[in-house]
Amino acid sequence: MAPSKVVIYAMRRELRLSDNPIFHHLSNPESKHGFSHLLPVYVFPAQQIDLSGFVPKGSENPHPAPKSAVGGYARCGPYRAKFLAESVWDLKTSLQSIGSDLLVRAGPYKDVIQSLVEGLKAKECQVGAVWMTSHEGSEEKSEEKTVASFCAKSGIDFKLWDDEKYLIHDRDTGITHLNDLPDVFTTYRKQIEPLREKARKTLPVPEKGALPAYPDIDMIPSQQPPFNIPGTCEELVDAVVRPVKNFLKDLPDFPEKAESSHPFRGGETSAHKRIDHLVLSGGMKSYKDSRNGLLGPDFSTKLSAYLAQGCVTARQIHHALVAYEDGTGTKYKGADGFGEGDNQGTETVRMELLWRDYMRLCHQKYGDKLFRVEGFNGKHTDYEGEDKKYGWRTANTSIALPGQEPTPEKVSEILARFNAGTTGMGLIDASQRELIHTGYTSNRTRQNVASFLAKHLEIDWRYGAEWYEMLLVDYDVSSNWANWQYVAGVGNDPRGAARIFNPVKQAFDYDKDGTYVRTWVPEVAKFENLENVFQAWTASKEDLKTAGLEGNIMVTDPVKPIKFNLDHKPSKVKKRPFFRKRGTKTRDAQGSAESPGSSDSHSGSGGSPDGSGGGNIPSESNCAAAGSGQAQQTHQGSGRSQSSSNHGGRSHSHQHNQQNYHHSHRGNDYTRGGGGGRGGRGGRGGGGGGYSASQGYYGIGGGYRGGGRGRGGGGGFRGRYAPTGGLGGHHHSEQQVASQFQTDA
C-alpha cells in the first residue's frame, strides 16, 4: 500500500466549491498532482477574530481581542462574524456532499499549520504541500510569508495560487507592471472594455468522489488548547458573535417599523440563490435605476458580502447575466428581457464588478499606503509650488496638533455621537443607526457618511473606515479602505478634496418623502416638514414639543448644522465654518452653520469617478458625485497632505453675490477674474465673474447674470467639458459624476 501523501489547503476568502481553481485542479484526473489525501482547513485568525468564544469557561484566551489601530474598534463585528461562520459551515456541508470535508480551526495561521503538519507526521502521514490563495492586505501577506517560511524550513512544498474571484483575471488586463495601472478608473476601464467579452469561463463543481480522500478523523491532530471547535453551525455562529455583540455602549433600540435591507444568510448556496432571484425578479435589469435606493432588500444586488468572502466569483455573476442576456439559461426564461441582449442594468452591474477589480489592483499598487492617513496621494503641491501640509482632527492627544480645536477630548465625544447616529444630521444618523442594527447601509448613504466625517468635520477618515470594517457585513479590505480614501480626498479621485456631499441636499434628493430617515431615526418621525426631519434643530419650539425632542442633543447641540433653502439656492451666511487663516487656529467643529449647498456633490445618472463620462460607477464600496444643475461647485487647487501627526486644513465658504453662486474650497486655490478669468484646461473664462482655478481644474464661464456669453466656461472639468458659458441668469451643471462606495454588485 502506497504511503499517504497529504496536501493541506488553507482556505481564507475563497469559501466556495464551484469556480475554485484548487478544487478544480485536484479533481481533474489529468492534473496528475500525486496527492492521496486532501485536507481543506479554515482558520479563524486570532489577529482579526476575537477567539474568546472558542475558549471554555475557566480558561483564558491567550490572544488579546483584536482592535483597530486608530479607533480601537473590534476588527470584526457581529454581522460579518455571523455571515462568515455561516459561509464556512455552508462550504463544510458542500464538501461533505461530495465525499470530503472542511476542518475548522482557530488561532494564528502559522501555529495551526505547524500543528497539523507535525501531528500528521507523527501519524506517519507525509504532508506533500501546503497551498493557499493569494489575498490582499498586510496581515494576509504576513500570513502567507510565515506559512511559506515554515514550509521551507520543514522541506514542504508551498504554493500560492491566484485569487480568481474577480471579473477580469490579472493576466488578462494587459498590465504587465503595477506601476502601469492608471490612477484614473476611466482610463483603466477603456483599456479593459468590452467587459462582456473579457471574463474567463467559470470552473465546474467537482463531482462526488473526484477530490483526493479526506484523511481519517483519527489521523487529524486535535485543535490546540485552549480552543474548542463547535460541532454545529449555530454553535459556531455563537462562538464568533458572542464576544463582539456588545460593541456599542447604550445601543439604541431597534426601530419598531424598521427591517434589515440585508437579511441574507452567508454561504455559496445562498449566493447563487440570490443571483437567480435578482435575474428572475428583474433586479438585474432595473439595477441602474434602483441602485440609489435606501430601503429594502432589492434596490441593490446585496452580492457584495458574498464576493468579499469568496462565496461567489464576479465571473460567475457575469456568466449568469450572459445566460440571461443570450437566452441560453433556461432557468431565467421567465425573466423580463430574457434573450434580448445586455441592457443598462446588466451593464452597470458589470461596471461595478470592474470597479471592485480596480480597487484591488490599486491596493496591490500602493500596498500599505491604503491604511495611511495621507492615502495614495501623499504630499500635494498647489499651483504656486507651495507644499500644503494639512492635518486631521483626532481624538488621540499624542498626535493632535498643539491647540487643536475642537480638542481631542471633544473629537472623542463627536466620534461617539457620529458612531451612534446622534449628530443631528438626519441622513447621517439614519445610516449609522441602520449600520449598527443590521451591518448594512446603502451605497448612497455610505458616500454621505464618509464625506460628512472627512470633509465636513475634517476628522481623521480612518476612524470611519475602521468603524465600517467592524460593522459592515460586506467589508472588503481593498474596497473599504480605497473608497474611504476616495471620498476623503486622499485616494485616486481626480477631484480629491473638491468632491464634497451636502447631506441635507442629498436627503432631499434621495429620501424625497423622508421615509428612510423617519424609519431609522424614529424621534423625528412626527415632523411634517422634511427640513425638520433632515435637521431637527430647524423645527419650531411647538413642533419640538409635540415630537418630544425638547432638550434633545440633536436639537440643542447638532454636530454640524447646515443651512439649506428648499429652492436649493444658497443662504447668505456670514459665518464661515472651519475657516482658518494661516497661522491661526481652526474653529470648533460645532461652531457655525455651513452655507447651504456648500460644495454639494450630487450624483446623477452617467459619469464616472473621474468625471470623464461612462456609467454610474461603483464604490463598496465605492464614492462621490457631482453637480445636479444647481449653481454649486467645489474647487480644489492644492489638495492636502496628511500624516498621523497632522490635522486640519483651511476651508471656508464664499458667496458671490452677483452670480448667487456658492463656492467651497480649501486653501487659496482660485482667484476671481473680474472681467473673465482664466478657465480650465479646455477654454477661457467668459464675461464678468469668471474664475481661475488652481491647476486649471475648473473654468466657470461668465455671463451668469451680467455678462453675455462666456467662451470655454460652464464649469469644464479639467477642460474636458468646457461648453459655452451660460446666458445671463443661467448656469451650467457640472458633468454629473457618480461612484459607489462599497461595491454592491
Curated annotation (Swiss-Prot):
Ranges of compositional bias, category Basic residues: 571-584
Subcellular location: Mitochondrion
Presequence extent in this chain: 1-22
Keywords: Chromophore, FAD, Flavoprotein, Mitochondrion, Transit peptide
Alphabetical GO biological process terms: photoreactive repair
Disordered: annotated span: 563-688, 702-745
InterPro entries reported for this sequence: Cry_DASH, Crypto/Photolyase_FAD-like_sf, Crypto/Photolyase_N_sf, Cryptochr/Photolyase_FAD-bd, Cryptochrome/DNA_photolyase_1, DNA_photolyase_N, Rossmann-like_a/b/a_fold
Domain of life: Eukaryota
Essential cofactor(s): FAD; (6R)-5,10-methylene-5,6,7,8-tetrahydrofolate
Transcription in keyword set: no
Polar residues bias: start-end ranges: 735-745
Main location: mitochondrion
Keyword hit for Transit peptide: yes
UniProt GO MF annotations: damaged DNA binding; deoxyribodipyrimidine photo-lyase activity; FAD binding
Any one Gene Ontology cellular component term annotated for this protein: mitochondrion
Pfam families xref list: DNA_photolyase, FAD_binding_7
Cofactor comment text: Binds 1 FAD per subunit. Binds 1 5,10-methenyltetrahydrofolate (MTHF) per subunit.
Annotated ranges, domain Photolyase/cryptochrome alpha/beta: 23-166
PANTHER family the UniProt entry points to: CRYPTOCHROME, CRYPTOCHROME DASH
Function recorded in the entry: May have a photoreceptor function.
Protein name: Putative cryptochrome DASH, mitochondrial
Gene that this sequence comes from: cry
